[in-house]
Amino acid sequence: MRLWHQILIPLLPRAQLLGQHRECAALRGAGWGRPHATVNYVFTHSPYKLYLYHALIMEEMEKRGYKPDVLWKDPLYRGKAVAPYHAHAAETATSPIHAEHDDAYLDECLENLKSKGIML
């Protein structure tokens, strides 16, 4: 799984949006720091950046009538199986949240979606 370019979040079909929530939850929990070719870049940033991205996903889910567990809205929460962070510095959201989400990454994401039969 990959983290879709954040500009695509409002356009993602249901399955991809909900998949992003699962991916973010896994990465914020026990998956933090575990190598995975398509998401390794998130580990070079503060976990707070991933929280900010996940917050965008949850906001879009709520716009569509889904109700993600409110526990995930806590930036220190890491899931039921992992102890929460004690603290980490809050950061101002940048656009894009992850600098890696540039125009080339957007094109890569669009091609990936196209290969799945999803035209945005």
Predicted regions and their residues:
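Expand to "…catalyze enediolate/carbanion chemistry for C-C bond making/breaking, isomerization
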Residues: 1-120
